[in-house]
From Swiss-Prot:
Efficient DNA binding requires dimerization with another basic helix-loop-helix (bHLH) protein. Forms heterodimers with bHLH transcription factor TCF3. May not heterodimerise with bHLH protein HAND1. It comes from the Eukaryota. Residues 1-27, 37-56, 118-177 are annotated as: Disordered. Keywords: Developmental protein, Differentiation, DNA-binding, Neurogenesis, Nucleus. It is found in: Nucleus. Residues 140-150 have a biased composition (Low complexity). Transcription factor. Binds to E-box motifs 5'-CANNTG-3' in the regulatory elements of target genes, probably as a heterodimer with another basic helix-loop-helix (bHLH) protein such as the transcription factor TCF3. May bind both open and closed chromatin, acting as a pioneer transcription factor to allow other factors to bind and activate lineage-specific genes. Required during post-implantation development for the generation of some differentiated trophoblast cell types. The keyword Oxidoreductase does not apply. In contrast to the mouse ortholog, the ASCL2 locus is not imprinted in human placenta. This is Achaete-scute homolog 2. Gene3D superfamilies: Helix-loop-helix DNA-binding domain (4.10.280.10). Residues 50-102 form the bHLH domain. One of its GO terms (molecular function) is RNA polymerase II transcription regulatory region sequence-specific DNA binding.
Amino acid sequence: MDGGTLPRSAPPAPPVPVGCAARRRPASPELLRCSRRRRPATAETGGGAAAVARRNERERNRVKLVNLGFQALRQHVPHGGASKKLSKVETLRSAVEYIRALQRLLAEHDAVRNALAGGLRPQAVRPSAPRGPPGTTPVAASPSRASSSPGRGGSSEPGSPRSAYSSDDSGCEGALSPAERELLDFSSWLGGY
């Protein structure tokens, strides 16, 4: 050996990723696990960003459709304060109350129809006070508009039943179908909304 030369050392080993064991074999399972962990992070910058953008676009479209649905529902439910936009929760509550009021009206109408069909005199069928959306006052409901005065659908005898479709309020009702007359009676029932 030369006195001034140092023995040559082995070439430096490739750097080992942080967090991996100090094994230097490239085929070691530990090194493979570390390299697999790094790959998805680099893949997200390319294909992952597009997937995130598509997901965000789908969510924006979903929210847009939900908002359009609420906008359409607001147009169909009655609300007292027309000057302010109902919140989503208020819209849903108003829709529930509106549906319940319609169900009560249909139940009352069916009871009157059944009583008239059976030849029985309808008993004073009065629905419970209709509850409208918050802030509105209930309106008295009576789709049959029973009265003792003679009219197109009634008789001159006091207390005799009248047709649920008759009304003395309008002179053009004779040209309307029964469904249209029922809607007119219903709209007068909702007059306060």
